[in-house]
Amino acid sequence: MQTSAATQARSKFYNYYTEGNEFMEEGDWERALEAYKASASLEWEDTKKKRIYGTRFIKYFPHRQIGIAYFQLKEYHKAKEELSLSLAYKESKEAKKFLQKVEEALAPKEPPP
């Protein structure tokens, strides 16, 4: 039985995304970032309902996850770009929360009195 190229691509994006989630849970932000970027290169748009196999769907937010990883790595401008992109595709509370944290991190700090 042969699998189609589309099925193989679907499998790969999901594997990369799952791998990214595992690295994120471990706090390995750099490896999570690599995995999420690989996933996004195959399936670009953030969505609440992404088909993975047959009738199975997942919540798929690669740009949000990339933004969170950049935030954790203190690369705030890149985080802002990815989180904004995620919100342009599909709003999520998590993306909004981290975008607010990014804005706070980028805000000019007032010197102590």
Language-model-detected regions and their locations in the chain:
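Residue-level recognition of tetratricopeptide repeat
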Residues: 21, 61, 68-70, 101
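Residues that mark the junctions of alpha-helical repeat units in TPR/alpha-solenoid scaffolds
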Residues: 12, 52-55, 59, 92, ...
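Pro/Ala/Gly-rich low-complexity, hydrophilic intrinsically disordered segments
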Residues: 88-113
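Amphipathic alpha-helical segments of tetratricopeptide repeats
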Residues: 38-48, 85-88
